[in-house]
Amino acid sequence: MRAAPDALRIAIVAPPWYSLPPKGYGGSELVVHLLHTELRRMGHDVTVFGAQDSEPGVTMLADAEWSHDLGGPDHSARLATYLARVYDALGGQRFDVIHDHTGFEGLLLALYSGAAPAVVHTIHGELVEPMSTFYKEVHTRARLCAISLSQAAAAPTLRIAGIVHNAVELPAAPPSSSHERYLIEVARITPDKGQHLAIQVGQRAGRKLILAGKVERTRDGKRYFEEQIEPFLSPMVEYYPNVAGQQKARLISRAAAGIFPLQWSEPFGLAMVECMVAGTPVLALRTGSTPELIEPGVTGFLAEDVEDLVEAAARLDQIDRVRCAEVARERFGPHHMTERYISVYRRGSVEVEPLAAPSAEIVEVLSRQPAAPTPQPSGR
C-alpha cells in the first residue's frame, strides 16, 4: 500500500511465544496482528518482529518450540535471546516509534537502543508490585499504555499515556438472533477463571455448560482440574481442551451467553469481547475490567455472586443479540484500537474513553499527565 504523506515509521516488537496471528492461544499476539495489519492498511511503514510460523511481513526471530518455555525455567533466557536478535536486526535503522509488547525487558532495550525518539509500551498483564515499581523508574521516558482503567488504577501515581482497550478480530458473518441454550466459558482452566463457579451456575440455571481451554500447566492448575472440574464432566458439562478457528467461533456464536465468574482482577478479557462481537451476551462477576467492557442490558449483565449470575441467566432473552454485536464491534474493532495508538504515537497521550465512570482518583491522575513531544515522520 502506498505510504500516506504523514506516515510514521513504526517498529513493533511482539512477544516471542506464539505466531502472528496466533493459531489458538496468544492474546497479546492477536492484538499485535490486528494492530500492524491496520497500521499498514492506513499507509504507515511498519516493521514487525515475532515468532516462527507468522504471517508474511513479520520478521520471525523466535523459534516456534519456545512457546513451551512460556512461564517455565527457560522463559527469561528465551526472551533475552529473542530481544538480542530483534535489536541486532534493527541495527542502525531509525524509526519514529518503537512499540514494545514484550514486558519490562523489551522496554528497557527499546529505551536504551536509541532507535526511535518515542518508545510506546503496552502493559498486557496485571499491574502489581514489583512491576509497578519498575514502571515508575521509566514512566517519564516511555509512553506507557494501559489496556483498561482498572489496570491503570492499580498504580494511580504512574504516568499513563493512554487507556487503549484491546481489539478482537470481527466476525465476517452478520450477527444472528438465533442461538442454543448452553453457556460457555473460554479460558485457561485455573482457579482464577472460576470454572467451578460456572459449573454451579449452569447446574442451578438448568443450562448445559461448555468449558473450552487448556488446563494451566502448573501443579495448582492440574489439581484444580482433577478435583473441581473433571468429576463434574457429563453431558451437561462438556470440556473442550483445544478450540480455535471456526470451531471456537461456532461454539461462541451459538451459545446463549458467555460466562466469566472471574476470581481475580483481570485487566482485560479478550474472550468476553469475542463473545460480545459475535452477538453472544456475557455474564460476569463485577471485578477487574468487567464494568468497563460490559454494558448491562445491552452486551450482558454484571453480577456480585453466583446467585446473581443464575438470576441474570434467566434474563438473557432481554438482550438484543444483533444490538449487542453492533455495540461491541464499534467499541472493540481493530480500527478503533489502532486510531487510539496512533494518537499516542503522535501526541504522546490519548483521551480516556471509559464505559463506566472511573474513580475520581484515576481521572485526576490521567488528566494531569503532560503530553510527550510529538514524533516527526523520519526521512526515508
Language model features by range: what are they?
Residues 1-380:
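Catalytic cores of nucleotide-sugar-dependent glycosyltransferases that transfer UDP/GDP/TDP-activated
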